[in-house]
Curated annotation (Swiss-Prot):
Lineage: Eukaryota, Metazoa, Chordata, Craniata, Vertebrata
Protein name: Coiled-coil domain-containing protein 137
Alphabetized UniProt keyword annotations: Chromosome, Coiled coil, Phosphoprotein
Regions of compositional bias (Polar residues) in chain numbering: 234-243
Low complexity biased stretches: 1-16, 222-232
Organism whose genome encodes this protein: Bos taurus (Bovine)
Length: 292
């Protein structure tokens, strides 16, 4: 035992006076560590002690208040585009990490231990360590909330009939607007006239389409009068289509009227012959003499 203590004392550094013996160099090191811990962390966001009603160190110089310094620092960061870009980049990285976690799903709370015998670890210590970790995992699994991994996710809630009808009406209106726009675009394309290079126009175009809200009025000289129809050269009255019986009756009436007219003319001629005197009979070749 004395040899082991001497070996430990020989292995220990010169600054320490053994494992349990407090010495002067060890106390100095503890003082240095205490000073390092007491010193504030470097950086603009270090916590400063609030001094209330304290006498200034220098009477000629007055320190800037803490709040004012914070406001000035925040304004300086806003003016500096590099810090803003860095802040945005950090926010984007954090957001992407959260999205990845949500995509992967909830990680298991209990980590599965992996056993491997360490270097210079005895078999007994290795078995004891495995038993401790196994007991710890069993304890965590017992106190963990009940899980149901075999249960499937709840089906999505179907849309109500009212919502379906509303979406259908909205889709119909959108389709109708698209059709109206397409018709208007086609109408604009039809109304647009493409004039070729070197084309000659003899007269302005005639507008045949009427305005929507206009009242149709006949212009002077363009009224459809009966006299214009009669005087027009191409206006020939077309015979009306009648039946065969009607045509036979009309033909008989026409023939009777013609026969009556001929009989009347013959009777008038006979009366004239009886009333007028007959001229004297002259030999052929002689003309009647004229008396003065």
């Amino acid at each position: 035992m004395a040899g082991l203590r001497r070996g430990a004392a020989a292995v220990a550094p010169a600054g320490t006076a053994g494992f349990g013996r407090p010495g002067r160099p060890q106390g100095r090191r503890q003082q240095e560590l205490g000073k390092q811990r007491a010193a504030p962390r470097p950086g603009p966001r270090s916590k400063e002690k609030k001094k209330v009603n304290c006498k200034p160190k220098n009477q000629d110089e007055q320190e800037i208040p803490f709040r004012l310094r914070e406001i000035m620092r925040s304004r300086q960061e806003m003016k500096n585009p590099i810090s803003n870009k860095k802040r945005k980049k950090e926010a984007q990285a954090a957001f992407s990490k959260t999205l990845e976690k949500e995509a992967k799903g909830v990680e298991p709370d209990i980590a599965i231990p992996k056993f491997k015998q360490r270097k210079w670890e005895s078999d007994r210590a290795y078995v004891r360590r495995m038993e401790q970790e196994a007991q710890h995992v069993l304890f965590l699994s017992k106190n963990q909330a009940n899980r149901q991994p075999e249960v499937q996710a709840a089906p999505k809630k179907e849309k109500s009939e009212r919502k379906k009808a509303f979406q259908k009406r909205r889709l119909d209106k959108a389709r109708q607007r698209r059709e109206e726009k397409a018709a208007e675009r086609l109408e604009q394309e039809l109304l647009q006239d493409t004039v070729k290079f070197g084309e000659v126009v003899l007269q302005p175009p005639e507008l045949t389409a009427k305005p929507r809200m206009s009242v149709s009025r006949d212009q002077p000289g363009k009224k459809s009068l009966m006299l214009k129809k009669l005087l027009s050269p191409g206006s020939v009255s077309q015979p009306l289509t009648t039946s065969l019986a009607r045509q036979r009756i009309v033909a008989e009436e026409r023939e009777r009227a013609v026969n009556a007219y001929r009989a009347l003319k013959r009777l008038q001629q006979q009366r004239q012959e009886t009333q007028s005197p007959q001229p004297p009979h002259l030999p052929p070749g002689k003309k009647p003499e004229m008396q003065l």
